């Protein structure tokens, strides 16, 4: 039986509440500010009570306000972010799944060397890789394209490692039984590995889709055309260095709309996400 200690429980709950406040307050203030005019937002002291411009601000931002500021519609920014997030998440999962499958279940020369070469890339900072990657994208003419935005970000050493570790837990008897039943490698992968890996795939999809949605540095480098901007780049370009000339109400509305999709992904896939992180199905 776990001993109940009221003081420890109280301290633990206070720490949790403090953490929630620290995380939630910026989101709350962003929402509150999205209901105010730009003048009200920059006028001190900061109001923590919601304004009365909900319909006006959101209607204007969605139907032309953002486009007047950054030269591209809010819908286009959200669509670009959606395409980038889905392409990166799905691409990373497919490539990592296939790579781990080959490393674990195929016997070929230097397979562990190739695995460690993939794994070592985790030790390389983004800044080290980004310049040669950018040079390749420029030479291939992929600036201002979805391919340029997504292809360089599809390889994932982390996902490959996680899939490899999971595949190593597959009983050898299961592999041997599939071989006796004349199941080829791709049938084994499709009929056995994919069903067993569904919770791991779901957990990785949540993490990787949010990773793709929140990309800033790479889209900033490879997009010159405003029509290829993601929502994060659009937000940055909406903010002028002079506060008085920034439409802060549109900025706050855009920020709220930008965080809704990741929240929906986490909420809708929460059960699969937790299950994929803490359980192993076999």
Swiss-Prot record:
UniProt family annotation: Belongs to the binding-protein-dependent transport system permease family.
Metal-binding is among the record's keywords: no
Keyword list, A-Z: Cell inner membrane, Cell membrane, Membrane, Transmembrane, Transmembrane helix, Transport
Function field: Part of the ABC transporter complex UgpBAEC involved in sn-glycerol-3-phosphate (G3P) import. Probably responsible for the translocation of the substrate across the membrane.
The protein's assembly and partners: The complex is composed of two ATP-binding proteins (UgpC), two transmembrane proteins (UgpA and UgpE) and a solute-binding protein (UgpB).
Protein's membrane topology: Multi-pass membrane protein
Transmembrane segments: 14-34, 86-106, 112-132, 146-168, 201-221, 248-268
NCBIfam families in the record: PRK10973.1
UniProt superkingdom: Bacteria
Organism expressing this protein natively: Brucella suis biovar 1 (strain 1330)
Record lineage: Bacteria, Pseudomonadati, Pseudomonadota, Alphaproteobacteria, Hyphomicrobiales
CDD domains linked: TM_PBP2 (cd06261)
Entries under Gene3D superfamilies matching the protein: MetI-like
Protein localization: Cell inner membrane
InterPro entries noted in UniProt: MetI-like, MetI-like_sf
Protein name: sn-glycerol-3-phosphate transport system permease protein UgpE
GO cellular component, one term: plasma membrane
A Gene Ontology biological process term: transmembrane transport
Domain (ABC transmembrane type-1): residue spans on this chain: 78-269
SUPFAM superfamilies noted in UniProt: MetI-like (SSF161098)
One family name in Pfam for this protein: BPD_transp_1
């Amino acid at each position: 039986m776990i001993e109940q200690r009221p003081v420890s429980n109280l301290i633990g709950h206070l720490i949790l509440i403090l953490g929630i406040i620290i995380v939630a307050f910026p989101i709350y203030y962003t929402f509150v500010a999205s209901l105010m005019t730009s003048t009200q937002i920059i006028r001190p002291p900061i109001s923590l009570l919601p304004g009365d411009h909900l319909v006006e601000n959101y209607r204007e931002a969605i139907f032309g306000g953002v486009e007047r500021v950054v030269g591209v519609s809010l819908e286009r920014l959200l669509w670009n972010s959606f395409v980038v997030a889905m392409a990166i998440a799905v691409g990373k999962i497919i490539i990592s799944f296939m790579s781990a499958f080959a490393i674990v279940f195929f016997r070929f020369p230097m397979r562990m060397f190739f695995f460690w070469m993939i794994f070592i890339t985790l030790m390389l900072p983004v800044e080290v890789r980004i310049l040669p990657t950018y040079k390749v994208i420029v030479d291939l003419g992929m600036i201002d394209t979805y391919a340029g935005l997504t292809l360089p970000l599809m390889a994932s050493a982390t996902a490959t490692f996680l899939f490899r570790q999971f595949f190593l837990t597959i009983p050898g008897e299961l592999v041997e039984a599939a071989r006796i039943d004349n199941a080829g490698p791709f049938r084994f992968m499709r009929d056995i590995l994919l069903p067993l890996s569904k919770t791991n795939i779901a957990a990785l999809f949540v993490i990787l889709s949010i990773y793709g949605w929140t990309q800033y540095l790479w889209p900033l480098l490879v997009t010159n055309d405003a029509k290829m901007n993601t929502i994060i780049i659009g937000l940055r370009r909406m903010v002028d260095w002079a506060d008085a000339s920034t439409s802060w109400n549109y900025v706050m509305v855009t920020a709220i709309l930008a965080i809704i999709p990741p929240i929906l992904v986490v909420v809708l896939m929460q059960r699969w996400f937790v299950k994929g992180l803490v359980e192993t199905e076999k």
